[in-house]
């Protein structure tokens, strides 16, 4: 570790160790702490600051609110030959994902397509680590979930939707997968929280205030409603996530999750839907040809100077592996108070 007046530089091992210390010190089981520390380290490594070590503050706050069970043991049920459900029992979601992933992969490789529902989980993390884990098995992955009702539908002013992210990963023959992970809101909730914490203005298309007017004040945005991206198109996708990641799998919508919170301010509790496809089953002897089609499309994008989604993350990943990560000292000091 090195330190300046403004920043602290940590290796990835030091980030992981810090996360483990904070989580176990605050009552998290070793299994949950390991699963969460892995993903927080990945977020910080890829310079996804709203999903890196900042999330330790969110995790501990939720634990202290008494909603999350830090010792919950996920249970798994096979609903059919290609559908698995994992009950998180009001624990954080990441251990449930790790519990169900091997079964999801097995089912997808047997049938060509499989789905996993994660129920009754508290969820704070990005989805790209999950779909990247699916792509690492040679599979195509999709994941989505509702959250708390922070987002107004296009043309409305009252929150109905969550930030409702959708993530997708496509395995590539060489190198990193093609990945995207984006909220159907104009921006992730955590980014507005970070702007408020740092006293920075936000773009007016991110949110509206309590009177329904566009705002550049992040604190007013947090008291008002976030906006969807892409107008009515973003609203439609957000509704789809509510249906697939909530109603379809027997779990709460974002409005129900907000009501369940009872004003405590914990991490959202809801469900998550994960789908995996096996290109080998779909394509058979044409597998290489199918993947080659994808590669030609990617080349047609990058060949004209455009970037593929997540390229910034992958560039950051290489930097962090080589040089460590930089964390604002004020944030680092705040995280250390969680060890008091």
From Swiss-Prot:
Active site: 50-51, 191
Disulfide bond positions: none
Record keywords, A-Z: NADP, Oxidoreductase
Family recorded in the similarity comment: Belongs to the LDH2/MDH2 oxidoreductase family.
Function: Catalyzes the reduction of Delta(1)-pyrroline-2-carboxylate (Pyr2C) to L-proline, using NADPH as the electron donor. May be involved in a degradation pathway that converts trans-3-hydroxy-L-proline (t3LHyp) to L-proline.
Binding site for NADP(+): 123-127, 181-183, 232-233, 307-313
Source organism (scientific name): Burkholderia ambifaria (strain ATCC BAA-244 / DSM 16087 / CCUG 44356 / LMG 19182 / AMMD) (Burkholderia cepacia (strain AMMD))
InterPro entries attached to this UniProt entry: Mal/L-sulf/L-lact_DH-like_ah, Mal/L-sulf/L-lact_DH-like_NADP, Mal/L-sulfo/L-lacto_DH-like_sf, Malate/L-lactate_DH-like
GO terms of molecular function: oxidoreductase activity
Protein name: Delta(1)-pyrroline-2-carboxylate reductase 1
Enzyme Commission (EC) number: 1.5.1.49
Keyword Oxidoreductase attached: yes
Complex and partners: Homodimer.
Keyword NADP annotated: yes
Catalytic activity: L-proline + NAD(+) = 1-pyrroline-2-carboxylate + NADH + H(+); L-proline + NADP(+) = 1-pyrroline-2-carboxylate + NADPH + H(+)
Enzyme class (EC, first level): oxidoreductase
Binding-site list for substrate: 55, 163, 189-190
């Amino acid at each position: 570790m090195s330190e300046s007046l403004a920043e602290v530089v940590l290796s990835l091992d030091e980030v992981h160790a810090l996360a483990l210390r904070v989580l176990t010190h605050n009552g998290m089981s070793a299994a949950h702490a390991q699963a969460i520390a892995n993903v927080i380290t990945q977020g910080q490594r890829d310079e996804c600051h709203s999903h890196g070590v900042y999330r330790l503050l969110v995790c501990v706050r939720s634990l202290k609110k008494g909603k999350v069970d830090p010792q919950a043991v996920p249970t798994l049920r096979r609903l059919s030959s290609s559908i698995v459900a994992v009950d998180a029992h009001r624990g954080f979601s990441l251990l449930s994902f790790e519990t169900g992933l091997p079964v999801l992969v097995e089912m997808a490789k047997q049938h060509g397509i499989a789905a996993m529902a994660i129920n009754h989980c508290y969820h704070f993390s990005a989805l790209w680590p999950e779909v990247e884990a699916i792509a690492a098995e040679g599979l195509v992955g999709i994941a989505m979930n509702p959250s708390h009702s922070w987002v107004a539908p296009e043309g409305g002013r009252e929150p109905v939707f969550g930030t409702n992210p959708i993530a997708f990963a496509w395995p590539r023959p060489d190198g990193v997968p093609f990945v995207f992970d984006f909220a159907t809101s104009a921006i992730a909730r955590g980014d507005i929280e970070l702007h408020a914490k740092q006293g920075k203005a936000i773009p007016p298309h991110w949110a509206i205030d309590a009177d329904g007017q566009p705002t550049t004040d992040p604190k007013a945005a947090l008291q008002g409603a976030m906006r969807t991206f892409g107008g009515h198109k973003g609203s439609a996708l957000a509704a789809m996530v509510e249906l697939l990641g909530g109603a379809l799998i027997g779990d709460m919508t974002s409005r129900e999750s907000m009501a369940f919170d009872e004003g405590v301010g914990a991490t959202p509790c809801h469900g998550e839907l994960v789908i995996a496809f096996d290109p080998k089953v779909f394509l058979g002897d044409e597998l290489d040809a199918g993947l080659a089609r994808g590669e030609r499309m990617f080349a047609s994008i990058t060949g004209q100077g455009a970037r593929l989604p997540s390229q910034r993350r992958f560039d950051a990943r290489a930097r962090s592996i080589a040089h460590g990560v930089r964390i604002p000292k004020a944030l680092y000091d705040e995280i250390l108070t969680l060890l008091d």
